Amino acid sequence: MTEPVRVEVKTASPYPVVIGRGLLGDLVAEFDGARTVAIFHQPPLAETAEAVRAALAEKGIDAHRIEIPDAEDGKDLAVAGFCWDVLGRIGLTRSDAIMSLGGGAATDLTGFVAATWMRGVKVVHVPTTLLAMVDAAVGGKTGINTEAGKNLVGSFHEPGAVFIDLATLETVPHNEIVAGMAEVIKTGFIADPVILDLIEADPKAALDPSGTVLPELIRRSVEVKAKVVAADLRESDLREILNYGHTLGHAIERRERYKWRHGAAVSVGLVFAAELGRLAGRLDDATADRHKSILDLVGLPTSYDGDAFGDLMKGMQTDKKNRAGLLRFVVLDGLAKPGRLEGPDPSLLVAAYSAIARDPRPAGGTVLL
């Protein structure tokens, strides 16, 4: 990919997702008209944030960089409160803007802060992990975690633009790319089987940030999400398909107190959802089996603690897709044919979980992808 690619998210307030390399000039131009810009970044990205701040300052913009905690630790009400305090101190107004620089947790938190500050100010996302590029940064979902569950406090607040600089993937740990691949694979199963074909043809190339396959996977994933979000911004119907594998995945994250990466938890959730679809008579064996095989190819987990089912059931009871006290799952009726399964018999859930259950982990053990 030599020239930047623009994917338009055609909602009521349309915005571009720009995919390419060396996008600093395009990024800075996005803030024309703002007097003040707050750059919220995770700790490892201080140097990049400073480069953006300096470029904005050269244009006469009063830019500030503010460090936020890494990963899920940042998606906390206390951190949001800190961010609001900073915005107050620097005098950020509705004609100004906020920028996120980091992974999915950074986009979730920063989007939430932007949605709530003065009831909504412009936010521009610069995702730096694969997961954030193909999922969190696109679509306008924002949120923080509470004891009640993951992302239960949040808002829909669309960004003004998203800039995906592929060069940033060359600096992140390999396991970050592996974790993000869960969302890419999910997209392949619900909407674009070519994604699965590309990964299966050369798993190593699919994980190589300097090659040509990964940018293609990112573009395809973003295009799918853009179409779904344009049709159903507020997740009243179609957008639920993007939560394929997430019902169990979120419950795993909560049980692990967010020490598991999101992608690792979703990977297990995908295998569970496939088994659920198979047992419900909705999904053919070949497509169900393909879930585990392709996730194994890229090094993602496909099993979880066999003693955890009771805890996970409690976690799934808080899922946002549930209605009238009934669990609701996204399942497949075939490749790229997502549907819903409402109120499945508990015995079906037990049977599906048995397919992913493994021996309980050693005391104090955990899995960090």
Swiss-Prot record:
UniProt binding sites for Zn(2+): E183, H246, H262
GO CC terms in record: cytoplasm
Bilayer-crossing regions: none
Database matches in Pfam families: DHQ_synthase, DHQS_C
Names of the cofactor(s): Co(2+); Zn(2+); NAD(+)
GO biological process: amino acid biosynthetic process; aromatic amino acid family biosynthetic process; chorismate biosynthetic process
Xref: InterPro entries: Dehydroquinate_synthase, DHQ_synth_AroB, DHQ_synth_fam, DHQS/DOIS_N, DHQS_C
Example of a GO MF term: 3-dehydroquinate synthase activity
Cofactor remark from the record: Binds 1 divalent metal cation per subunit. Can use either Co(2+) or Zn(2+).
Entry function: Catalyzes the conversion of 3-deoxy-D-arabino-heptulosonate 7-phosphate (DAHP) to dehydroquinate (DHQ).
Xref: NCBIfam families: aroB
PANTHER family tied to this protein: 3-DEHYDROQUINATE SYNTHASE, 3-DEHYDROQUINATE SYNTHASE, CHLOROPLASTIC
Protein name (Swiss-Prot/TrEMBL): 3-dehydroquinate synthase
Organism: Rhodococcus erythropolis (strain PR4 / NBRC 100887)
Gene for this chain: aroB
